[in-house]
Amino acid sequence: GFPHHALDAYLPKLVRNGYRVAVCEQMENPKFAKGIVKREVVEVVTPGVAISDKILDHKKNNYLLAIYLENEIAGLSFSDISTGEFHSYEVHQNDIPQQIGLINPSEILVAKKQKGILEPVIQKTSQSITITKIDDWIFTFDYGEELLTKQFNTLSLKGFGIENLRCGIIAAGANLNYLRETQKENISHLNKISGYNPSDYMVLDFSTKRNLEITFSMSDGGREGSLISILDHTQTAMGGRMLKKWVSARSEEHT
């Protein structure tokens, strides 16, 4: 624990090192408290669920990714709590490493029973991504569908383009559950979800991005000296994020 005024100094360091941080605040005036002052956890900050200006690079999305496997099909759902972006889709399980490289998440959620299968795949792609194990009952279709329809205030998921994605819905439910738990349900701006088609983009694997120094320099891993640092003359955070998406995964659409 540390004083509230030291939060901005310690929180970024802890989260960037992969720690989960529970922010606890006093809920009553110490002068009027009987005994120990009442305190409650008001927010849980993790690498994939952060909204603080001190932690985020606002020209880069901070994605939380959930992965669920069933019969060689991988359901993937990624979100950015700071922007309200929320997607879900399915691929063959052999394509998981490529998709992790495309999304570049800060944190990945997996079911406890699938950790042994997914952890080696994730770590082979990147050693720096935080892997969080979630209770298996959360990765179920009925729970995921109920949670999503309640969040979007709808009777079904028709119209979002994911109603036939069983594994995708399971992954999206786990993603949303994690956001609700860490943000204490303060996620009303997350009001829609959409499908995602990775075949619409030319995907570059991690080693190619590294060797071409597209988004980071090989010398120190920083942004300076990379292609994006030269191209980026955007004036807003949204513009910076959009440019990074275009450079990292070029659209296959020809106009």
Feature locations, PLM:
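Charged catalytic and DNA/RNA-contacting regions of genome-maintenance
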Residues: 1-252
